[in-house]
């Protein structure tokens, strides 16, 4: 993939990619700060800021002005917060990409953060927090994160806890932004039917004068916790279960083998978990696995939502599939199919401008360089059955597993981590 890349004198990294066949253009601004950079007294700040940038900026002082300008050309603007990044994006017809860039740059650089808006949006965020806490399927993922990263921001809810969010102020939000929205943490990517030289100049004019700020180191990831099981008693028709293991950081040499292993285990309707737990045993409607990779840590998690009376059976069946990956090499036919699945997902992602802009910005922020599709395909094709069995045996051992469950009290009280040797923590429904 050919693209243009420049680092501005202040440290902002810029990537632009002309896609002559596209009718759209996409802006992606990745800022290398998320909930991981927070403390117990300001947890939820990154997410709060993500909300606040839509409330008004220096040149567009109301939320309606921002939305009307973007939607007036048929476009969209969005933002999201993760553990290590906050993302601001826009998707528009290609002829309007400079407008989209101007709006997104305005949101990142000059949000008003007015006291009245903070008070109003606080109520919205509190309701968002309550919504997720009411949903057992969301709560169980929070519990497994807390087990995997004990007493650490990587294990906390991105939106924060209600008592802390109630105390956040406009002054605190501004201070956090001034500290962490440093040019060296900002990546701007534009893809679509654009003029690359024009796009590069436009980014330079909007981000080139940001003042340089000293870097702030993130708190290192914690060691794995001793508590292996965490459950929440909550009325409902289902038990929601997560089984998790610590994995590897973003740049670890085993990352791609674990990616392939995860696809075999729990991605898609042809994955082993889906075929065994849903198609064969009819235990669940939703069963899957997923991975997350951070700068210095990572994890792999299995999720299933099941009838409470069959929760133990579902856990046993899922662990049996993991044990099979440790004990038996993956057959050649399955390995070829899953390699093609992973490669195909990469190729399809790059068919549209949104995928390309996020691809460029994400790799630049997290990897410090852009891997070509051809390089990734070569890496994937080089992973063999022995590699998969090795990483399964190293990372997915039963004594390294953690278990979280949310559901009826009698059900979750019976569930423990696979080796059954660690503390069981019960919570009251809230």
Name each model-derived stretch.
Residues 2-3, 7, 18, 65-222, ...:
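Charge-rich, well-structured scaffold segments of protease-associated domains
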């Amino acid at each position: 993939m050919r693209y243009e890349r420049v680092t501005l004198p202040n440290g902002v990294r810029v990537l632009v990619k002309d896609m002559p066949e596209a009718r759209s253009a996409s802006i992606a601004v990745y800022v290398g700060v998320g909930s991981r950079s927070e403390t117990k007294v300001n947890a939820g700040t990154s997410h709060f800021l993500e909300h606040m940038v839509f409330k008004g900026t220096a040149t567009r002082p109301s939320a309606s002005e921002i939305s009307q300008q973007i939607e007036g050309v048929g476009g969209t603007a969005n933002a999201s917060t993760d553990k290590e990044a906050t993302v601001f994006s826009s998707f528009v017809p290609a002829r309007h990409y400079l407008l989209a860039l101007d709006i997104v740059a305005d949101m990142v650089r000059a949000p008003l953060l007015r006291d009245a808006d903070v008070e109003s949006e606080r109520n919205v965020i509190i309701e968002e927090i309550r919504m997720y806490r009411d949903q057992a399927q969301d709560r169980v993922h929070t519990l497994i994160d807390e087990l995997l990263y004990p007493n650490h921001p990587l294990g906390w809810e991105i939106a924060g806890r209600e008592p802390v969010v109630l105390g956040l102020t406009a002054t605190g939000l501004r201070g956090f932004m001034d500290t962490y929205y440093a040019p060296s943490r900002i990546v701007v990517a534009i893809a679509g039917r654009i003029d690359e030289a024009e796009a590069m100049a436009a980014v330079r004019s909007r981000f080139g004068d940001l003042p340089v700020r000293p870097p702030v180191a993130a708190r290192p990831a914690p060691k794995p916790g001793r508590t292996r099981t965490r459950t929440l008693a909550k009325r409902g028709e289902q038990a929601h279960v997560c089984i998790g293991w610590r994995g590897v950081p973003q740049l670890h040499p085993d990352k791609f083998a674990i990616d392939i292993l995860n696809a075999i285990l729990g991605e898609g309707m042809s994955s082993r978990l889906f075929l065994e737990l849903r198609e064969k045993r009819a235990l669940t409607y939703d069963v899957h696995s997923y991975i997350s990779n951070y700068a210095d840590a990572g994890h792999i998690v299995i999720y299933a939502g099941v009838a409470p009376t069959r929760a133990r059976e579902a856990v046993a069946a899922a662990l049996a599939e993991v044990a099979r990956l440790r004990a038996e090499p993956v057959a050649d036919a399955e390995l070829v199919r899953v390699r093609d699945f992973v490669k195909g997902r990469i190729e399809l992602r790059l068919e549209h401008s949104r995928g390309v802009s996020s691809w460029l910005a994400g790799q630049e922020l997290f990897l410090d360089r852009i891997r070509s599709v051809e390089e990734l395909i070569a890496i994937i094709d080089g992973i063999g059955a022995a590699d998969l069995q090795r990483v399964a045996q190293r990372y997915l051992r039963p004594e390294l597993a953690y278990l979280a469950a949310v559901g009826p009290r009698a059900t979750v009280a019976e569930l423990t981590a696979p080796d059954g040797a660690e503390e069981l923590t019960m919570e009251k429904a809230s």
